[in-house]
């Protein structure tokens, strides 16, 4: 456990950020699974948007976002 006050604060902030990131990644994965279960244009847009948001926030790498979107598009068409 950290002894320095700033390190204690950073540890708490890291914990909060980790929980938030996990929720956002989970939501993204859920949308992808919904699309894969029933590929529709509406679900594709939702999943694609979620992937873009995750990439812009640094949750996933930009190349992974591009790859995931391409795979979803292939399943759509």
From Swiss-Prot:
Superkingdom, natural source: Bacteria
Pfam family, one: Ribosomal_S20p
Claim: Acyltransferase is one of the keywords in the record: no
GO BP: translation
InterPro entries: Ribosomal_bS20 (IPR002583), Ribosomal_bS20_sf (IPR036510)
KW Amino-acid biosynthesis (keyword) present: no
GO CC term (a single one): cytosol
Molecular function GO labels: small ribosomal subunit rRNA binding; structural constituent of ribosome
Keywords from the named record: Ribonucleoprotein, Ribosomal protein, RNA-binding, rRNA-binding
Gene3D superfamilies: Ribosomal protein S20
Family stated for the protein in its record: Belongs to the bacterial ribosomal protein bS20 family.
PANTHER family per UniProt: 30S RIBOSOMAL PROTEIN S20, SMALL RIBOSOMAL SUBUNIT PROTEIN BS20C
Function of the protein: Binds directly to 16S ribosomal RNA.
UniProt protein name: Small ribosomal subunit protein bS20
Organism whose genome encodes this protein: Lactococcus lactis subsp. lactis (strain IL1403) (Streptococcus lactis)
Gene behind the chain: rpsT
